[in-house]
Regions:
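Post-DEXD/H (motif II) to motif III coupling segment of the RecA-like Helicase ATP-binding lobe
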Residues: 77-137
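Conserved Walker A/P-loop ATP-binding site and its immediately adjacent core
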Residues: 2, 6, 15-36, 197-200
Length: 303
């Protein structure tokens, strides 16, 4: 609600107030529309919410000073050439960049777009101040050796990971932990995401969970009717989504209570994006359980 409150204060008494909210995909756009409808309904007609791709195609249709307030969600994308052109075309009174992952893989800095940070809040500080849910992290160790898995400069090579990590014993270990420690009491009521390596891994994890009487569904680019699957998840008909690629960035479901990090990564950006999916705090959710699957990394370091 920080942005909504700031927009409300900024717009007070300004008849010419107009705001633009930019986001990378339609899922995040839908979330913003819901938030604006709920919290800023009187200003709804003066706030445009657009995807990056739409803005790239149409930004020149507005004058440079048309918007007085611009929000760039998932702002670590802002240094991409086309999006950067859009942002620098406009001359708002106030420009806000929102990101939990200001460290980009290509090392480009967001100060190029937004200037020096006015406010910077570490994840640890945010948890201590109650801005986000506290993460209760549990590490489960495997005997899988990743020391021979190649590194492409940003992260592990997926083809190598598949050979090393798609091991039945490792998958069963994850299922057993969920069955032994997360099926009773408050923990047993929580829904979760299992971050997998690839599409085949999502299917294997879902099959094993269902066999253990824990309702699960694979969720990837191969999923038929993904909107229906997501709706069933939000209606609590599915307890775990076994996902790859589709919900690392921007996806929001405040009730999410368990994150299983089943995909090894050396990317701090990806790791924080995945952790961030469960950090939305609600009136009844104060913490999120993070199950970190720790393999043998050899000389490599974890994010």
């Amino acid at each position: 609600r920080i942005v909504e409150e700031d927009i409300q204060k900024f717009a007070a008494g300004k008849e010419q107030f107009r705001a633009l909210i930019l986001a990378p995909n339609t899922n995040i756009i839908a979330d913003w529309k819901e938030r604006i409808d709920k919290d800023l309904q009187p200003l709804q007609n003066r706030i445009d919410i657009k995807t990056y791709s739409y803005a790239v195609r149409h930004y020149h249709e507005k004058t440079r000073d048309y918007y007085s307030y611009i929000v760039v969600d998932e702002a670590h994308h802002a240094v991409a050439p086309m999006l950067k052109r859009v942002i620098q075309y406009y001359a708002p009174e106030f420009l806000v960049g929102l990101t939990a992952t200001d460290q980009r893989p290509d090392k480009k800095r967001l100060e190029e777009i937004f200037g020096n940070y006015t406010t910077e809040l570490s994840l640890k500080d945010a948890m201590e101040k109650g801005v986000v849910a506290r993460a209760n992290v549990y590490r489960i160790k495997t005997n899988i050796d990743l020391s021979h898995v190649r590194f492409n400069g940003k992260d592990y090579v997926n083809a190598d990971l598949e050979k090393s990590v798609r091991v039945t014993s490792r998958n069963e270990l994850i299922v057993n932990v969920l069955k032994d420690y997360f099926t009773e009491g408050d923990a047993g009521k929580r829904q979760g995401i299992i971050f997998c390596i690839n599409k085949a891994h999502t299917k294997e994890m879902a099959r094993l969970l269902n066999a253990a009487d824990i309702s699960a569904q694979d969720y990837s680019g191969d999923t038929k009717h993904p909107e229906k699957v997501m709706q069933e998840f939000k209606e609590h008909k599915i307890r775990f989504l076994c996902a790859c690629d589709m919900i690392s960035e921007g996806w929001d479901y405040p009730e999410l209570g368990i994150l299983v990090m089943a995909r090894p990564t050396l990317s701090k950006v990806l790791y924080l994006q995945q952790i961030g999916r469960g950090l939305r705090r609600t009136s009844i959710k104060k913490n999120v359980f993070v199950i970190d699957v720790v393999d043998e990394y050899g000389a490599m370091v974890r994010p």
